[in-house]
């Protein structure tokens, strides 16, 4: 069988950065 490699964590959408 294929060696199970750890899958990368899903990219979480970041909240919009407030412009100051």
Swiss-Prot record:
GO terms for biological process: defense response to Gram-negative bacterium; innate immune response. Keywords: Antibiotic, Antimicrobial, Immunity, Innate immunity, Secreted. Induction: By bacterial infection. The keyword Oxidoreductase does not apply. It is found in: Secreted. One of its GO terms (cellular component) is extracellular space. Residues 1-20 are annotated as: Disordered. Belongs to the apidaecin family. Antimicrobial peptide active against many Gram-negative enterobacterial and plant-associated bacterial species. Not active against other bacterial species like H.pylori, P.mirabilis, B.pertussis or N.gonorrhoeae. This is Apidaecin 3+. It comes from Pimpla disparis. The lineage of its organism: Eukaryota, Metazoa, Ecdysozoa, Arthropoda, Hexapoda.
């Amino acid at each position: 069988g294929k060696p199970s490699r750890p899958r990368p964590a899903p990219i979480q959408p970041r909240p919009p950065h407030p412009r100051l």
